[in-house]
């Protein structure tokens, strides 16, 4: 996960010509779109999320002077994750140069993907079959306690479907 700080030049929205602006929100918006495009176009099935965006001074009549945002990149393969991080850094550098907005990118933390143990997963599949339950393999890019446990001991997880596939939502429901 990364914190990104985009600095522009706050200025009057009505009197500052477009070609003279250093709009931090425009630069941040380009980062948001670049993050989405990276994940969609990258081979495999990585995910990328901009989950927080803070605009300053956050006023309708002022060209935004700074924006703070977070970027969360995830994949089950650490090589793919490293490629995404390198691509993010390139995109941020390019966008900063094109918009004239200085951009600082700071790593907040890095979590290596942890694979479930084959033996544990086989036991889960066997138990589901014995009970006549359907099952499928679902790689998880979420950070669970199991991720840390799996670094020391054999680990596996059981997921049950929520209605509509929703998670981390007030509408999440599982029965």
Placement of each model-derived feature along the sequence:
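A short beta-alpha structural unit
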Residues: 49-58, 69-77, 102-121, 141, ...
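Solvent-exposed, non-transmembrane alpha-helical starts
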Residues: 80-84
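Zn-dependent metallopeptidase/amidohydrolase metal-coordination segment
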Residues: 135-175
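His/Asp/Glu-rich mid-to-C-terminal helical/loop segments that flank catalytic regions of hydrolases
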Residues: 19-42, 85, 90, 160-175
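Short, low-order "capping/linker" segments at domain edges
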Residues: 113-131, 156
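Midchain, well-structured core segments that form catalytic/ion-binding scaffolds
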Residues: 1-79
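Acidic-glycine-rich active-site phosphate/pyrophosphate-binding loop
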Residues: 1-8, 126, 156-159
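Flexible, glycine/charged-enriched surface loops at secondary-structure junctions
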Residues: 37-50, 95-106, 132-139
């Amino acid at each position: 996960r990364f914190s990104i700080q985009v600095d522009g030049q706050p200025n009057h929205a009505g009197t500052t010509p477009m070609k003279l602006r250093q709009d931090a929100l425009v630069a941040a918006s380009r980062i948001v779109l670049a993050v989405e495009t990276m994940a969609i176009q990258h081979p495999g099935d990585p995910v990328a999320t901009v989950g927080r965006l803070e605009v300053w001074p956050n006023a309708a009549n002022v060209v935004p002077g700074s924006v703070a945002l977070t970027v969360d990149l995830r994949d089950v393969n650490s090589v793919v994750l490293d490629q995404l991080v390198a691509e993010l850094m390139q995109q941020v550098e390019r966008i900063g140069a094109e918009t004239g907005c200085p951009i600082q990118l700071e790593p907040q933390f890095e979590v290596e993907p942890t694979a479930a143990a084959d033996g544990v997963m086989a036991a889960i599949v066997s138990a589901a079959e014995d009970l006549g339950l359907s099952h499928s393999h679902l790689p998880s890019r979420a950070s669970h306690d199991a991720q840390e446990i799996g670094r020391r001991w054999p680990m596996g997880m059981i997921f049950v479907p929520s209605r509509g596939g929703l998670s981390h939502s007030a509408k999440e429901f599982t029965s």
